[in-house]
Amino acid sequence: MIKWAIIFFIISLVAGLFGFTNISAGAAGIAKVLFFIALAIFLIVLIFGVGLGMLVF
């Protein structure tokens, strides 16, 4: 998911460079959403991993 966020970030930069501001804003918004979803999934997995690790040891 981080890969897609980076791809949309690059699309946003290229579109902004060529003056397509609406496309740039849309791609940047998608990149932000994907980044925060990936961050939330990482934190959930981290919490479960620590919790289950405590149960095992």
From Swiss-Prot:
Organism: Azoarcus sp. (strain BH72)
GO cellular component term, pick one: plasma membrane
Location in or out of the cell: Cell membrane
Entry keywords, A to Z: Cell membrane, Membrane, Transmembrane, Transmembrane helix
Keyword Acetylation: no
HAMAP family recorded: UPF0391
Segments passing through the bilayer: 1-21, 33-53
Pfam families in the record: DUF1328
Name this protein carries in UniProt: UPF0391 membrane protein azo1765
Protein's membrane topology: Multi-pass membrane protein
InterPro entries for this protein: DUF1328 (IPR009760)
Family to which this protein belongs: Belongs to the UPF0391 family.
Cell division recorded as keyword: no
